Amino acid sequence: MVQFSPDTHLIGWDASSGYHESDSVIYAFSLTHLSGTGIGDLGDVAILPYSGADTLRPIAQFDKTEEAASPGYYSVRLKNFGIQTELTSTDRVGLLRATYADSTDRKLLLDLGHILQPNWGHKVVGNDFRLVNDSTIVGTYY
């Protein structure tokens, strides 16, 4: 089941679900999370819209007052990138909409190696993807 949501913490107990209330940065939005299990895992297929300088690991800053959430929907403004981001999901699909302040500087990080709690032995076994066109990416992740 898809649980599309932000990953604000990557290592340690506070990263168990990917999101921690005390955090003010978003590393990525990932498609799968465990909830209520007492242990962290998943955080599969990380996506982060960003702008500005290319970097290996862009990190978004956000303000709690600019978050909105309801079942199946999450929205937040990525302050340092000037991007309004909205997520929604069904059982098997996650959809992200990014509205960039600067329409000429649009970038999207797709990280198939992202995982929560790598220090607990969690790892990506393999992945592959291909760009079909300028709006479609298909692939596998395991």
Q: Which functions belong to the PLM regions below?
A:
Residues M1-Y142:
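Accessory carbohydrate-recognition regions in carbohydrate-active enzymes
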